[in-house]
């Protein structure tokens, strides 16, 4: 289809008007729908599924913008491109939100029961899924909604069951009592990477544990006195001579008056503290291992909500931290308290609720990680490894996998994938299967659900129809090409996707993983509610437009680095788009109704035309190459420099000469170059700014229905002319140098000057002589001399450029008497400023009373004013010599 619409671009760029209706039109036309069975080479990206918990933040906007840039570029390059959308059920996060909402109505999930609570959560999901889609639309993401997935969809649930049952049958999923991270607020287990460690100023409590025979006591130290009721031994090092005679004897545990043994174990560090350690197997992972070695009982002393239970004796019912104080007070009352020392130590907190995590003995389900990690690491030694961008993150990933622990996958929640395990009501037999057991009424299903990350780990292939390996999408689009994600979830998600994909598909889940950093504020601080520095991307879009936000996010950082966000940067992008808008309007108003098939570059002879086409092709080359390497910051700078400097500031100004002249052939050639260059530039810019480029492209002479499915520009070697580039670069340098000299002596362009140019060699002499019309047009000289034997006057203003020296006699630039008078007036101003600031600095009262920063600021002003005064004096003296 070849067309050129009537010009329909208002004088002012209004993002809301430009963006209105375009996304809906793109969807109606199915431009983003992947073909799936095409002969085209496939390219796929699955969106990292956002949680259905609320608004998307700037991090999501950044993440998805990068993905959209990649997929739009690939679509234009002729790939069968799939950008697959979807959302995550986000077990603990979503359940917490729904419970908080119910709490406002004084209802708990237990009041509703499991089934009704899950129904309520599905309602929440539907509401927030719509909201998330609206945000995707606002951002302009080219998603294939016909393939949208949700982690609790039937198909994905089948994949989850398949994986669980297979791993269980291989002995890689097991159930057992172990110390896990327990969130007493959410009342669920957490995996290690759902625990945030914070340095807390706590205390070391030194206490006496009396020997049962009354012969003395052992000194123990603890940061968690509330666990004392769960102590079942005191351990010493087997080679610690201080305690050799006590090994095998017993302690009378204070307050509870329970006899516990003194055991020898190499876990104890002799040099740390007293060398005697209380052992609480049900509330500490290291103590759990000691307990196993010595067959010690495991006494759980807390309820799941963090209050003490009846094993804690008199402390039953107290909150754990209240119990801590009560126990210490009782030790003091019994004369068994030695001392309390301040102690900075790392304390685990729940990532979701912020509660202090309790090491807790619990019956949970685990994935045996060592064999799975080994397979994933082996992949990285092959050609088919996952390529980390930047490469340094591969080491981060490998170190994590080398030191991985078994993964606790069960969660004490109602919202999520229920564990496919059933227990026989009479025999206690365990059945694990993809389908329910026969005689279901005789079985009870496990109450727990799976960790959210269990289903997310299958995302790249479960969304493609796996376990049906004959599914067309699975065969065509898997493995995916690129994963874009933040470095903060390499452990949570990236590592798990890799090992699950290797285990179940035998392939990597994605060829590349592009890792970005975090969005920070302009001062480099992490955005958070407590600092009040968070930014809603939709508010930014409403004010500046999606294109401004997208370009700012995409070009504001290099791979792996954090992004400092500021509204000034968005405003700067908005100004850039305004520049593009105004330049486009100028081009369109001067095309004289040109059609696409009337664009003719066969008569290009002008150096400026050859130069802009050369620069255009250099830009195509750079943008394509940098884009392949995900260097979008550099892509942005390349496009900015070409559009703002080369096209707008230089070529359009030069184009006005033939456009406003009488030569019709020159006019038509210039129109062709303008239309061709702007059309090509819009296609290069489109992945970054989809809305405004579609608007401009539709008004330009173009081929096709939409810029979204237009062809990606390719380098045309025949349009590249190195001589024209050298010539134009020389001319631009000369013109800039003359403009700078004019600015320095305050001479307007309207005043003619005498211009003398001394070229470096014959090549530059020829360039300058052949293109003297450009110098005459943009420098306004009454006379130009280009020669090797120029002898400049002593007062000539000079400049050196790469191919020549430039001289402008000063007397030809300005009216000397008027300029001296103006400078003397300026000198008077600086004399007053110097006197004022020195008056302050010579005032002892000011120096002694004013804050240091204020005094320092005044000293800086003094330095600045003295420099300006000296500069003006020097110029006056120079002019007087003339």
Swiss-Prot record:
GO molecular function of the protein, one example? ATP binding
EC class of this enzyme?
A: ligase
Which terms are listed as keywords in the entry? Aminoacyl-tRNA synthetase, ATP-binding, Coiled coil, Cytoplasm, Ligase, Nucleotide-binding, Protein biosynthesis
**Sequence motif: 'KMSKS' region, positions:** 526-530
Pfam families reported in the protein's UniProt record: Anticodon_1 (PF08264), tRNA-synt_1 (PF00133), Val_tRNA-synt_C (PF10458)
Where, in this chain's numbering, is ATP bound? 529
Q: Where is it located?
A: Cytoplasm
Q: Where are the transmembrane segments?
A: none
Q: Which reaction does it catalyse?
A: tRNA(Val) + L-valine + ATP = L-valyl-tRNA(Val) + AMP + diphosphate
Q: What is its main location?
A: cytoplasm
Query: Could you say which EC number(s) this protein's record lists?
Result: 6.1.1.9
What the entry lists under Gene3D superfamilies is as follows:
HUPs, Isoleucyl-tRNA Synthetase, Domain 1, Valyl-tRNA synthetase, C-terminal domain, Valyl/Leucyl/Isoleucyl-tRNA synthetase, editing domain
Give the coiled coil ranges.
Answer: 810-881
- Functional description taken from the UniProt entry: Catalyzes the attachment of valine to tRNA(Val). As ValRS can inadvertently accommodate and process structurally similar amino acids such as threonine, to avoid such errors, it has a 'posttransfer' editing activity that hydrolyzes mischarged Thr-tRNA(Val) in a tRNA-dependent manner.
Q: How does it assemble?
A: Monomer.
Looking up HAMAP family in the UniProt record yields: Val_tRNA_synth_type1 (MF_02004)
Q: Which family does it belong to?
A: Belongs to the class-I aminoacyl-tRNA synthetase family. ValS type 1 subfamily.
| UniProt cross-references to PANTHER family, sorted A to Z | VALINE--TRNA LIGASE, CHLOROPLASTIC_MITOCHONDRIAL 2 (PTHR11946:SF93), VALYL-TRNA SYNTHETASES (PTHR11946)
Q: Quote the record's domain comment.
A: ValRS has two distinct active sites: one for aminoacylation and one for editing. The misactivated threonine is translocated from the active site to the editing site.
Q: What is this protein called?
A: Valine--tRNA ligase
Organism of origin: Listeria innocua serovar 6a (strain ATCC BAA-680 / CLIP 11262)
UniProt lineage:
Bacteria, Bacillati, Bacillota, Bacilli, Bacillales
């Amino acid at each position: 289809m070849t067309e050129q619409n009537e010009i329909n671009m208002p004088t002012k760029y209004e993002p809301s008007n430009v963006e209105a209706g375009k996304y809906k039109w793109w969807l109606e036309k199915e431009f983003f729908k992947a073909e799936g069975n095409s002969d085209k080479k496939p390219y796929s990206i699955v969106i990292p599924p956002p949680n259905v918990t609320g608004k998307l933040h700037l991090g999501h906007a950044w993440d998805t913008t990068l993905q959209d840039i990649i997929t739009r570029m690939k679509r234009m390059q002729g790939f069968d491109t799939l950008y697959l959308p979807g959302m995550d059920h986000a077990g603990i996060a979503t359940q917490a939100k729904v419970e908080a909402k119910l709490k406002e109505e004084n209802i708990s999930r237990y009041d509703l029961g499991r089934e009704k609570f899950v129904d309520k959560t599905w309602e929440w999901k539907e509401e927030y899924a719509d909201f998330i889609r609206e945000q995707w639309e606002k951002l302009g993401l080219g998603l294939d909604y016909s393939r949208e997935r949700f982690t609790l969809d039937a198909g994905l649930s089948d994949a989850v069951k398949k994986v669980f049952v297979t791993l269980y049958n291989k002995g890689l999923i097991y159930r057992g009592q172990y110390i896990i991270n327990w969130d007493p607020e959410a009342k669920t287990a957490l995996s290690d990477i759902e625990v945030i460690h914070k340095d807390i100023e706590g205390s070391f409590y030194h206490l006496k544990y009396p020997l049962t025979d009354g012969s003395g006591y052992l000194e123990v130290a603890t940061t968690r006195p509330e666990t004392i009721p769960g102590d079942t031994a005191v351990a010493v090092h087997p080679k610690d001579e201080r305690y050799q005679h006590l090994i095998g004897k017993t302690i009378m545990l204070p307050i509870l008056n329970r006899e516990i043994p003194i055991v020898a174990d190499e876990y104890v560090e002799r040099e740390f503290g007293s060398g005697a350690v209380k052992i609480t197997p049900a509330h500490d992972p290291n103590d759990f291992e000691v307990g196993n070695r010595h067959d010690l009982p495991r006494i759980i002393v807390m309820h799941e909500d963090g209050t003490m239970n009846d094993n804690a004796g008199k402390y039953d019912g107290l909150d754990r931290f209240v119990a801590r104080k009560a126990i210490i007070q009782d030790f003091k009352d019994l004369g068994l308290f030695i001392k309390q020392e301040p102690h900075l130590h790392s304390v685990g907190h729940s990532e979701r609720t912020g509660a202090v995590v309790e090491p807790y003995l619990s019956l949970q389900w685990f994935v045996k990680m060592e064999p799975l990690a080994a397979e994933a690491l082996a992949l990285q030694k092959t050609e088919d490894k996952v390529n980390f961008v930047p490469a340094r993150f591969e080491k981060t990933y490998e170190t994590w996998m080398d030191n991985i622990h078994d993964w606790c996958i069960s969660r004490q929640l109602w919202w999520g994938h229920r564990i496919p395990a059933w227990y026989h009501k009479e025999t206690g037999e365990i059945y694990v299967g993809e389908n329910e057991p026969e005689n279901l009424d005789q079985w009870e299903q496990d109450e727990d659900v799976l960790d959210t990350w269990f289903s997310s780990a299958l995302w790249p292939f479960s969304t493609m129809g796996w376990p049906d390996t004959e599914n067309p999408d699975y065969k065509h689009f898997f493995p995916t090409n690129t994963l874009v994600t933040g470095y903060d979830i390499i452990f949570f998600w990236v590592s798990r996707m890799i090992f699950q994909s290797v285990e179940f598909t035998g392939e990597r889940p994605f060829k590349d993983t592009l890792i970005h950093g975090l969005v920070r504020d302009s001062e480099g601080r992490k955005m958070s509610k407590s600092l009040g520095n968070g930014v809603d991307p939709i508010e930014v879009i409403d004010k500046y437009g999606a294109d401004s936000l997208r370009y700012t996010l995409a070009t504001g950082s290099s791979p792996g680095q954090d992004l400092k966000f500021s509204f000034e940067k968005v405003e700067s992008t908005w100004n850039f788009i305004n520049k593009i808008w105004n330049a486009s309007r100028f081009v369109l108003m001067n095309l004289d109704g040109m059609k696409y098939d009337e664009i003719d570059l066969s008569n290009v002879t002008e150096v400026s035309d050859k130069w802009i086409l050369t620069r255009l092709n250099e830009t195509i080359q750079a943008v394509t190459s940098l884009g392949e390497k995900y260097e979008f910051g550099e892509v942005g700078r390349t496009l900015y420099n070409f559009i703002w400097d080369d096209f707008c500031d230089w070529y359009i100004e030069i184009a006005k000469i033939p456009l406003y002249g009488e030569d019709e052939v020159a006019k038509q050639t210039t129109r062709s170059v303008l239309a061709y260059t702007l059309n090509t530039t819009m296609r290069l810019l489109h992945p970054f700014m989809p809305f405004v480029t579609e608007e401009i492209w539709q008004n330009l002479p173009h081929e096709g229905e939409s810029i979204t499915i237009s062809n990606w520009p390719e380098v045309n070697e025949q349009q590249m002319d190195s001589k024209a580039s050298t010539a134009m670069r020389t001319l631009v340098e000369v013109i800039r140098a003359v403009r700078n000299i004019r600015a320095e002596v305050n001479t307007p362009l309207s005043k003619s000057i005498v211009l003398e140019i001394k070229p470096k060699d014959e090549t530059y002499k020829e360039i300058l002589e052949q293109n003297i019309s450009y110098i005459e047009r943009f420098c306004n000289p009454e006379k130009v001399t280009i020669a090797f034997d120029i002898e400049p006057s002593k007062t000539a203003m000079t400049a050196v450029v790469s191919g020549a020296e430039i001289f402008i006699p000063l007397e030809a630039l300005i009216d000397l008497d008027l300029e001296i008078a103006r400078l003397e007036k300026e000198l008077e101003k600086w004399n007053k400023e110097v006197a004022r600031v020195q008056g302050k600095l010579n005032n002892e009262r000011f120096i002694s009373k004013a804050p240091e920063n204020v005094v320092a600021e005044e000293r800086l002003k003094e330095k600045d004013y003295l420099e300006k005064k000296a500069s003006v004096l020097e110029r006056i003296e120079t002019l007087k010599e003339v």
